[in-house]
Amino acid sequence: MTGILVAGTSSDAGKSLVVTALCRVARRRGVDVVPFKAQNMSNNSMVCADGSEIGRAQYLQATAAGVTPTSAMNPVLLKPGTDRRSFVVLRGKPGGVLEAGEYTTGRRYLAEAAWAAYDELAASHDMVICEGAGSPAEINLRRGDYTNMGLARAKNLPVVLVGDIDRGGVLASLFGTWALLDDDDRALLAGYIVNKFRGDDAILAPGLEEITDRTGMPSFGVLPWVPGVWLDGEDALEVGRWRHEGDAVDPSSLRVAVVRFPRISNATDVDAMAGETGVDVQVTTNPDTCQAADVLVLPGSRSTVSDLEWLRRSGIADVVARRAEQGRTVVGICGGYQMLCRTILDPDGQETTPGSVVEGLGLLPVEVDFAATKTLALSHGTWRGIEVGGYEIHHGVCRSLEDAEAFLDGVHVGPVWGTMWHGAFEHDEFRRTWLADAARHAGSSWRPHSDELGYQARREAMIETLADALEAHVDVDRILHLVR
């Protein structure tokens, strides 16, 4: 057997979650299924057990499928460092850089690696559910495409098209995608799903019939908006999906502000905080919001130095310094931790000109040295006797310049905390203990609910909810039977 490709009419149409749900439904049916995304462009990544790096979305999909995540499931990961340059992760390891001008011409070696990974999965599993990237109708990118219709043509995959009705114009998006494809690609379109619908889908019926009449594509169903599900996203659009600026906030909530850096990475670190009842997490670029919060988080960054410069221009660096003087909690994770340190050395020019010395915010007695070798590792340790694990994705090597209280692998000075570990806050006891301390420090009455679902249990429940919705509203059997 082989696979199918789930493509979308746009970024954030819902491809990742549809693939997640399909993987879980196939697993329920006893199918040995694996996810695959030839190329992912995302700064939200995860370290596998073998030390390889893949997109968080594919890691989640592997969890839904009940298989061990590997680099074959996301053989090419592009991590944007600037608007014109991406860092390449090839089969889970650093693979150089890709300039914007090379995007359509310099990708043959990436395609070969991606398709070889697909063949590897197809040879060892019953079914491969592939996820496309962006839209398959970007005809300016057709040359060299290996993740959308290029993959479908190469591997003879039927394509399920996902359209997002929540943003409006779904019928035009479905028809427009079909219209822009050539005849060979159209022949691979097996049908479509309308995603994120709110209301009575009977009102859609005439439009769906018209789309089918014009294109020959059948509708596999209308998937409703599923509230309360915010699983690992890959797009910047998805950061903070659980909270929108301006939403009403319970005054008794523990208020957590997360700085939205231009090159924010692994923003999923705060998902677990957002899942706690009574914790209000807001991703923001507003200095006033950062000042008012009980806890301020500086998350990961793919471009630490440029995001540090932005932090200063935005006025948030002044807020961070003021909070430290006032004894108010600030925590930095990976790139955010490095910004809190005294100096950043870049001898090999990882982010700046070789030999540069960049002044940090100076709130932690630590020096950062950007090493040529990238660290990719799963890490384990304790904090106050609590077992904690995390994962590391960084070039920066941190050295303490004087004695400071240890915090996981990092340090803690007064109200300022720093760690290189992503994923630490996914551990329930650690997260709840740390947040409770932060609440007491802020004079907040918030305390964790001991009977509440933990982070991993909550994620599993969300996957099940998605799969249930897919089975209830979409002709899943018809989709799975497309596999030949």
From Swiss-Prot:
Pathway(s) the chain acts in: Cofactor biosynthesis; adenosylcobalamin biosynthesis
Alphabetically ordered keywords of this record: Cobalamin biosynthesis, Glutamine amidotransferase
One annotated GO biological process: cobalamin biosynthetic process
Active site positions, chain numbering: 334, 422
PROSITE patterns: GATASE_COBBQ
GTP-binding recorded as keyword: no
Matches recorded under InterPro entries: Class_I_gatase-like, CobQ/CobB/MinD/ParA_Nub-bd_dom, CobQ_GATase1, CobQ_N, CobQ_synth, GATase_3, P-loop_NTPase
Keyword Transcription regulation: no
Signal peptide: none
Stored Gene3D superfamilies: 3.40.50.880, P-loop containing nucleotide triphosphate hydrolases
Transmembrane segments: none
GATase cobBQ-type domain sequence ranges: 253-430
MF (Gene Ontology): ABC-type vitamin B12 transporter activity; catalytic activity
Role: Catalyzes amidations at positions B, D, E, and G on adenosylcobyrinic A,C-diamide. NH(2) groups are provided by glutamine, and one molecule of ATP is hydrogenolyzed for each amidation.
Family: Belongs to the CobB/CobQ family. CobQ subfamily.
Protein name: Cobyric acid synthase
Taxonomic source organism: Cutibacterium acnes (strain DSM 16379 / KPA171202) (Propionibacterium acnes)
Lineage: Bacteria, Bacillati, Actinomycetota, Actinomycetes, Propionibacteriales
Gene behind the chain: cobQ
